[in-house]
């Protein structure tokens, strides 16, 4: 490579390093907000879990209609986080090949349409730019309810484990019938209203979606920060490598020019 080619390559890598460093800083500043949203959403979902555990709510052993809600986002540059949830969703479809799928996020939508387009019945995008809100989750839950009743609903999402780890996970969202047939629902002092199971199911679904989106958002921000950190380190190593190559090539050019000058001067003598 010529000296100019090496110099151009070196400038390009330095620009990439600036971009990845900036993205890492942005991800780091968003991490605190993401963790607060995740902690808040966990409190809602854990409240639901305690309620249904006490009521001994369960899904039917043989479900005629199953819905899988796969939660991801629209943004990339965050490692394998989207492909992992797509892989887990496909594994679920191996168990229930006739299940309907709702995708939340363009990334999971694109991956599922490539392999299971006939299963995808509804998709949402515009998610993952900011920490999710209850209002967003409620709007999504309302649209999902318009699909009709399902015997079994499972929410697939990336669970935040630590700053360097996440894992594809799943939790159920119960149908009105499952709630109504809970063996110990009578232990709660609920009003005699036929709409209560439906209301509880809707709130539970909203909380499940909110928590899945919040966990996924925190996992994604963490994964992006780590990916940009690794990219910055790799760029730094390449900068050192090309700097050494540039200096050696430059020294060789100078040496050759000196040899030419000395040779020319000698021939004049």
Swiss-Prot record:
Cell compartments where the protein resides: Mitochondrion inner membrane
Entry's Gene Ontology cellular component terms: mitochondrial inner membrane; proton-transporting ATP synthase complex
One Gene Ontology MF term: proton-transporting ATP synthase activity, rotational mechanism
Keywords tagged on the record: ATP synthesis, CF(1), Hydrogen ion transport, Ion transport, Membrane, Mitochondrion, Mitochondrion inner membrane, Transport
Keyword Disulfide bond assigned: no
Membrane-spanning segments: none
InterPro entries in the record: ATP_synth_F1_ATPase_gsu, ATP_synth_F1_gsu, ATP_synth_F1_gsu_CS
Membrane-protein topology: Peripheral membrane protein
Similarity annotation: Belongs to the ATPase gamma chain family.
Function recorded in the entry: Mitochondrial membrane ATP synthase (F(1)F(0) ATP synthase or Complex V) produces ATP from ADP in the presence of a proton gradient across the membrane which is generated by electron transport complexes of the respiratory chain. F-type ATP synthases consist of two structural domains, F(1) - containing the extramembraneous catalytic core, and F(0) - containing the membrane proton channel, linked together by a central stalk and a peripheral stalk.
Subunit structure of this chain's protein: F-type ATP synthases have 2 components, the catalytic core F(1) and the membrane-embedded component F(0), linked together by a central stalk and a peripheral stalk. The central stalk, also called rotor shaft, is often seen as part of F(1). The peripheral stalk is seen as part of F(0). F(0) contains the membrane channel next to the rotor. F-type ATP synthases form dimers but each monomer functions independently in ATP generation.
PANTHER family for this protein: ATP SYNTHASE GAMMA CHAIN, ATP SYNTHASE SUBUNIT GAMMA, MITOCHONDRIAL
Name of this chain's protein: ATP synthase subunit gamma, mitochondrial
Organism: Pichia angusta
